[in-house]
Amino acid sequence: LSFKNLLIALNPSSGDGSGQSSSLPFLFATTFNAQLGPLSLSVSEIGMSVDLSFPGDGGGNLGIINLSPGFKPPSGIGLSLDAGIIKGGGYLQCFPERGEYNGTLELGIEGLLTLNAIGLITTQNPDGSPGFSLLIIITTEFNPAFQLGFGFTLNGVGGLLGLNRMVIAEKLQDSVKTNAIESILFPRDVVRNAPQIISNLQAIFPVKQGSFLVGPMAKIGWGSPSIITLSLGVIIQLPDVKIGILGVLKMVLPDEDLALLKLQVNFLGIIDPAAQMISF
């Protein structure tokens, strides 16, 4: 059992002068991961709320104070199961008051493939007005990989689709430095790492009505098992054309699951015709 953070929030309100009580609503919540055999559990922001109020007539359950505790349901729950041949899991995150619904899904079949999917849906614009947006990333990694000749293999394919979403070049550049780029290119353990992956994607691809994204991805390897891998993606924004070419080059020995030596290079190139800019 590992705790990721502790949230303590306070939103005081005052009475309206008509005898209504002023209150101090406290919120205590935490995010934690737990492992029980083959089952992994991730729970986000579960805890309790405490409403501390001061009735104008002094008729509280603690004299002049009224204390009302309550349960705060989690904002997200994830489950992951490793049952040998078949591995899978999912994560769901809901914020109805903000119109945000996010989820991740993973499915692995030993000796065949691993499928990961991430979806972000909003029904409100950032200003609170009604508006729909969607961001989906789907990746598939093959096991064993497809042989391409000369020691090269096709390890995986994937894609990104965004409706009413845009890409922020500066955030994409930051993702290269912070390694958040791996939240886009063939992310691993999408259920266990769902809160961080979703947060990264929301920052890089915010809502913008009338803007669309499309991005094919591929993962190429060399060696068997792959000693060197190149994860490459091209993200295209329309109609305000902006193109991002991003990649992760890795060399691991003897393999990624038990790496004694790991070298990694993240890179990004941006083509912005409107700004007449090409950067790498």
Task: Show which residues each predicted segment covers.
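Extended assembly/interaction regions that build large supramolecular complexes
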Residues: 1-280
